[in-house]
Amino acid sequence: MIIERARELAVRAPARVVFPDALDERVLKAAHYLQQYGLARPVLVASPFALRQFALSHRMAMDGIQVIDPHSNLSMRQRFAQRWLARAGEKTPPDAVEKLSDPLMFAAAMVSAGEADVCIAGNLSSTANVLRAGLRVIGLQPGCKTLSSIFLMLPQYAGPALGFADCSVVPQPTAAQLADIALASADTWRAITGEEPRVAMLSFSSNGSARHPNVANVQQATELVRERAPQLLVDGELQFDAAFVPEVAAQKAPDSPLQGRANVMIFPSLEAGNIGYKITQRLGGYRAVGPLIQGLAAPLHDLSRGCSVQEIIELALVAAVPRQADVSRERSLHTLVE
């Protein structure tokens, strides 16, 4: 349902999706598909000559797909550097114009300036480089202290869709960071799925069944979430089965408001989250879409370097949903006014 909803919104209001890791057969196939079916307006950031040679060597068409060369667009780089300076002040590097000749930095600047709706990277670049470009050029959302990520775990055969966080950014989150991750993930889930989040703060303990500093960290994070968002349905600490299986929840956490039906799982550490999503993906009959980066002031998202063409397409679609939902609401309001 999540991908179907994203496709419907994409057809109504195709987003401008920029790909900085463009010299990749998977990206060219994904961009061609998105363009062909009117699901997005892809932009490839690369040297046109290098991209043309790459496409020819792989016998691929690039008809109608926009290509922007950061090296030959000095005026754009100068304009982006001015925005960077206005936002970051003295933290802006003196060679900002030169740094923006890097495709990843340039693409981040495009979404920061509103000249693209979404940036999808990471198919060739490391997560560290993607996050560095986002933090340096885009910066954090006002009031945000913790950058994090969420995977959408989609069933291939049966079962509910789930959100898994944080699986790629914060190695050992504090209680305050876990609370930030939970709140950001709840917002992302609501924006992309249109459903109310039911958040489980995961641990190896359920309702105090074990005592350990790591358990206490999750318990403290849960209380912080409740204080900051009293309307949010959240519980913790819970083991995965107590969060996901109603029959187990009835035994281990009978008073839990989630009743074993959580849809957003907050892992206590990056180690647990990364292992958990890969096990779910490889053994559990689920496919992973993401990770969607949470906390940046503009949408920049990070693929796994082992991603497939389908995963690139799906991330491009779901990442654009919040913007497209806003466009649809604006059009509906405009129609009502008329």
Curated annotation (Swiss-Prot):
BP GO terms, sorted: ethanolamine catabolic process; generation of precursor metabolites and energy
Keyword Acyltransferase in record: yes
Catalytic activity: acetyl-CoA + phosphate = acetyl phosphate + CoA
Knockout mutant characteristics: Can use ethanolamine (EA) as a nitrogen source but not as a carbon source. Not required for aerobic growth on EA supplemented with cobalamin (vitamin B12); deletions and mutations in this gene probably have polar effects on downstream gene expression. A double eutD-eutM and a quadruple eutP-eutQ-eutT-eutD deletion are not required for growth in the above conditions. Somewhat reduced growth on EA, no excretion of acetate from cells. Reduced growth is due to residual nutrients from rich medium.
MF annotations from Gene Ontology: phosphate acetyltransferase activity
EC number: 2.3.1.8
Role played: Required for the use of ethanolamide (EA) as carbon, but not nitrogen, source. Involved in acetate metabolism during growth on EA, when expressed independently of the eut operon it can restore growth to a double pta-acs deletion mutant. Required for acetate excretion during growth on EA.
Protein name: Phosphate acetyltransferase EutD
Species annotation: Salmonella typhimurium (strain LT2 / SGSC1412 / ATCC 700720)
